[in-house]
Amino acid sequence: MKTIALVLFILVFGMSAALAFDVNPYHKMVKKLVRNNFKSIEEHRPEEIMDGVSDKTLEHSFAGDNSLSGTRHDKESLLRWFKRVNKVLPELKFEITDIQVKGGPSNTLVIARWTATCHLLNGEPYENKGVHFITLKWGKAIKFDVYENTKVVSHGLEVQYQAGILEAKAPKIES
């Protein structure tokens, strides 16, 4: 009886410790994937992100009222959107400040907080804090909700437009 109690204690303690210290292997893998995807955006390799996006169900929403805002429901539009980000803010870098992962492979919620920085073409520094809420199902992203300071985005796009990047004021990419 003591052996059973000891085994149960070890299992419960071990699971509690794993949850407390976030050693869930699936969650670690998802965090690494998210960091790699932000790096792909920085390095102008948006095609690499598309393998992790659902072919069937997709919703990508970026808050605001500018050339980057709106909602996309297909991979082709999402890829064009990522390419636009790279064109209008070519030096954009992300510092991921926190990633939280909840759930298992059949329904995963990722919350990624970040600070985006670059220098605009007029030399002005650009800094914007934001958060992604990403829903994954069986390894594929099905929903992205992106929130940031929309005034900062709009100002940055206006500066880039004035410096000659006409796509900074192009119509939204929506589908």
Regions flagged by a language model, labelled:
Residues 4-52, 163-175:
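Short, low-complexity N-terminal intrinsically disordered segments enriched in polar/charged residues
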Residues 21-25, 29, 85-175:
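A beta-strand edge to alpha-helix "cap/lid" segment located at domain peripheries
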Residues 32-42, 68-72, 88-91, 113, ...:
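Short, mixed-charge, low-aromatic patches
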Residues 37, 49-50, 58, 78, ...:
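Hydrophobic pocket/interface hotspot
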Residues 42, 57-58, 130:
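Intrinsically disordered, low-complexity regions enriched for glutamine and histidine
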Residues 47-103, 108:
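A solvent-exposed, acidic/Ser-Thr-rich amphipathic alpha-helical stretch
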